[in-house]
Amino acid sequence: MIGCFSMTQLRFGAKIGISELVCCFIAPFLFFIKYHEFKKDKVALYFWLLIFWVFGAILSDYINESFAAQVIRGFSVPVTIFSVSVCIYYNLRKNADGFKWLLFGIACSSVLSIFVFQRGIAGDLAAEGDISAAVESVIGYKLFWANTLMTWLTLPLFVAYLKVPRFYAVFVMAGLSVFNLLTGGRSMFLVSMFSLVLLILCGKKIETMRTVKKAFPIILVALLSLGLMAKYTYQYAVKEGWMGEAEIAKYETQSQKGTGILALLMSGRSDFFIGLIAALDKPLIGQGSQALDYKGYTGEFLAKYGTDQEILEYSRNQMQSNGMVGTIRSHSHIICYWMWHGVTALLFWLYVFYLSVSAFKNRMHYIPEWFGYFAITLPAFFWHYFFSPFGLRVNECALYCALLYLLKIENDRKRGYVSYGN
């Protein structure tokens, strides 16, 4: 049920996912009743850091005198992550094999949410009674078909990795890599290629899956090499005109300040650096939920490092808003919430990063049936962690809880009890 309604939303003044709403009611009781089990599994720290973040969010908003709407938006993030994580982890403890049904439900929800209980702007249109416009706004999103294609093509690798022919895994990830490159998705091309390399090298045998731990330094070098390959392949394809006029214009805009990796990052992911500057200005308390840019971080950064197009768009937005102050941009998991709520949020996201890196290095082989899921989702998560907003909350909480379950298995083994996996 959590998966089937993971992408559908209700409106009670604010928007909230159906699964998230149900979890918010159930989670406090589950956590209280099952806390001794969470503590025994040595995963309680994850949940305590979220509780700590909740109080940090309240304190930050109080000190920064945030508006009520901002407070609700900021407060809801750690509360939702806590609630969904408690429910998913509880169910994993009961039956880890049910994880595949959670993932299948999430995929089904991506289709269900096209037509009913839509998210975002589509949901607003549906609430006004314009159902056809709501559906059209979802399907018309530029990445809709790419995301849908990736969801359903990778689903067999998520839920039945050991039963899926190896050539299918290679074909799907190679195809997605080419698709991402041809559509200008440089970051997703890199992520898809990284997953492809993992699936080819590690295969389906437990012995080869363990090579991730042994070859971790080599994998890091390979990742850097893939990044450089993606950069130069993209540059060559654009200069040769293979990717169309729109992509040529995009590349010329982003390369105004240079063609080095840092220069391209600063022009293509300027929000990350703007948010980082704001976070460093108030690293302990934070700027408050959906912090307003009273100090002009955005304008100051763009004046120094922004492209002509970014400066033009920023000036146009300022004129259209009649000089009203906008929110501080960040477009990043860790930077956004560190900038909003200070050190309490930072500690949680650092712990999540530790969980993901340590699992990637040491634990991906514990449950061989899940290897395809981790090989595809973890590389994508590493990118999103730094350079994308926290959006599909149930999807990401599913990953965090899977990582917690691997930690449980490791701790069980240290006590001499093999609970699951190899």
Segments (PLM) and residue ranges:
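Generic structural signal for short, flexible, solvent-exposed coil/loop and linker residues
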Residues: 179, 261, 273-276, 323-326, ...
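A short, flexible low-complexity segment enriched in Lys/Arg and Gly/Pro that occurs
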Residues: 158-164, 254-269, 315-317, 323, ...
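Long extracytoplasmic/lumenal interhelical loops at the membrane interface
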Residues: 265-266, 270, 280, 285-341
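Flexible juxtamembrane loops connecting transmembrane helices in multi-pass membrane enzymes
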Residues: 228-274, 278-282, 289-300
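Hydrophobic transmembrane helix bundles of membrane-integrated enzymes that assemble
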Residues: 1-254, 329-420
